[in-house]
């Protein structure tokens, strides 16, 4: 397993992306809390992310994992890579994702790499531009991946056969 990756009781891959300490200033001083950003995936095209907040780190991680499991989305993959290039925004974070030839590996940094690892993508070229805020990068990555359509879905929407669509 990759560094920081675990497998849950339900067989899903879990990955912790970031933990952040936050403070709320009150009359008597500061109250500290923690936030956690996690991704979970089945390694076969389903992925979800979660953001949890709590006074203690383990509780924040647990909340994030539960939210990630509850919001899993399906991504149509083409074997170990993506079907076609995708660009997606969230806030001022912009992500490019492009299919790669077999043996390339995951060429992506930071939060994007964790998403691809739990999703089951093995060969991809990806770049994040603009804001590198992990929450926005993960959201842009997952939304971009979920926005991809399979050839069957495109053919059905256009009222054509898959052969006509794929040429």
Swiss-Prot record:
The keyword RNA-binding applies. PROSITE patterns: RIBOSOMAL_S5, S5_DSRBD. GO terms for cellular component: small ribosomal subunit. GO terms for molecular function: rRNA binding; structural constituent of ribosome. Keywords: Ribonucleoprotein, Ribosomal protein, RNA-binding, rRNA-binding. Signal peptide: none annotated. It comes from the Bacteria. GO terms for biological process: translation. It holds the Pfam family Ribosomal_S5. Residues 12-75 form the S5 DRBM domain. InterPro entries: Ribosomal_Su5_D2-typ_SF (IPR020568), Ribosomal_uS5 (IPR000851), Ribosomal_uS5_bac-type (IPR005712), Ribosomal_uS5_C (IPR005324), Ribosomal_uS5_N (IPR013810), Ribosomal_uS5_N_CS (IPR018192), Ribsml_uS5_D2-typ_fold_subgr (IPR014721). Part of the 30S ribosomal subunit. Contacts proteins S4 and S8. Belongs to the universal ribosomal protein uS5 family. The N-terminal domain interacts with the head of the 30S subunit; the C-terminal domain interacts with the body and contacts protein S4. The interaction surface between S4 and S5 is involved in control of translational fidelity. With S4 and S12 plays an important role in translational accuracy. This is Small ribosomal subunit protein uS5. It comes from Halorhodospira halophila (strain DSM 244 / SL1).
């Amino acid at each position: 397993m990759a560094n920081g990756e675990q497998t849950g009781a339900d067989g899903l891959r879990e990955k912790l992306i970031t933990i952040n300490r936050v403070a709320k200033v009150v009359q008597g001083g500061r109250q500290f809390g923690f936030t956690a950003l996690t991704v979970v995936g089945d390694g076969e095209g389903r992925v979800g992310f979660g953001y949890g907040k709590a006074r203690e780190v383990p509780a924040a991680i647990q909340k994030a994992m539960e939210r990630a499991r509850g919001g899993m989305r399906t991504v149509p993959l083409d074997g170990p890579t993506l079907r076609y290039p995708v660009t997606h925004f969230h806030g001022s974070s912009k992500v490019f994702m492009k299919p790669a030839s077999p043996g390339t590996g995951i060429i992506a940094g930071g939060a994007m790499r964790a998403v691809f690892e739990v999703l089951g993508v093995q060969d991809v070229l990806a770049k994040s531009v603009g804001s590198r805020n992990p929450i926005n990068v993960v959201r842009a990555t997952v939304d971009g991946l979920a926005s991809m359509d399979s050839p069957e879905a495109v053919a059905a929407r256009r009222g054509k056969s898959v052969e006509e669509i794929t040429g």
